[in-house]
Swiss-Prot record:
Secreted found in the keyword field: no
One of the record's GO molecular function terms: pyroglutamyl-peptidase activity
GO biological process: proteolysis
Protein name listed in UniProt: Pyrrolidone-carboxylate peptidase 1
Gene name of the record: pcp1
Catalytic activity: Release of an N-terminal pyroglutamyl group from a polypeptide, the second amino acid generally not being Pro
Taxonomic classification: Bacteria, Bacillati, Bacillota, Bacilli, Lactobacillales
Organism the protein comes from: Streptococcus pneumoniae serotype 4 (strain ATCC BAA-334 / TIGR4)
Length: 214
């Protein structure tokens, strides 16, 4: 089994992005699966072009995209990506689409094809906070997740794909009072065990509560 893991470069004035720093530290083999990582530009559309090129080159069985969600307290596998860009801030090339469909010929939304609840349980068993997230936002993270699943729908039907947000690293919150952070080693470990769950559960998931009341 081959798994491609992606990490964004820094954006929004940050000097580092924990997604990129974490994926760089992943071992090349996890739970018997071959793992490769790639850096993704935090740029609408260019991000998905880089992803598709790497998929064509590597031919992975699964894609796990990783992104920073500053302020979140744990690792959060995303349930769904919506067909909408609505950027609060410009991307790294100054693009700021507002209320713009990502793909005219795509679904209104795509659900993750990764075992998100098994991923959450695996992370929690390591003593790390994790929960299913029901919104990936409307910035480049949601954009890339949507594009990855669009590629599954249109071009790579045997591939699975999904996204997981991670918190700030501790050094990013030194001057951000009351903002959650996590050590890089814990972030890396959380991603590792999430990948273990992807390998173990393949086309199924745990039947556990992961919803919200509002």
């Amino acid at each position: 089994m081959k798994i491609l893991v992606t990490g964004f470069n820094p954006f929004g004035g940050e000097k580092i992005n924990p997604a990129l720093e974490a994926v760089k530290l992943l071992p090349s083999e996890i739970n018997g699966a071959e793992v490769r990582w790639v850096e993704i530009p935090t740029v609408f559309y260019k991000s998905s072009e880089v992803l598709e090129a790497e998929i064509l080159r590597y031919q992975p069985d699964a894609v796990l995209c990783i992104g920073q969600a500053g302020g979140r307290t744990g690792l959060t596998p995303e349930r769904v990506a919506i067909n909408q860009d609505d950027a609060r801030i410009p991307d790294n090339e100054g693009n700021q689409p507002i209320d713009t469909p990502i793909r005219i010929d795509g679904a209104s939304a795509y659900f993750s094809s990764l075992p998100i609840k098994a991923m959450v349980q695996a992370i929690k068993k390591q003593g790390l906070p994790a929960v299913v997230s029901n919104s990936a936002g409307t910035f480049v993270c949601n954009h890339l997740m949507y594009q990855a699943l669009y590629l599954v729908d249109k071009k790579f039907p045997n591939m699975r794909a999904g996204f997981m947000h991670i918190p700030y690293m501790m050094e990013q919150v030194v001057n951000k009072p009351n903002t959650a952070g996590m050590s890089l080693c814990d972030i890396v470990r959380g991603i590792e065990v999430a990948i273990e769950a992807i390998v173990d559960y393949k086309d199924k998931d745990l039947q556990l509560v992961g919803g919200e009341t509002h």
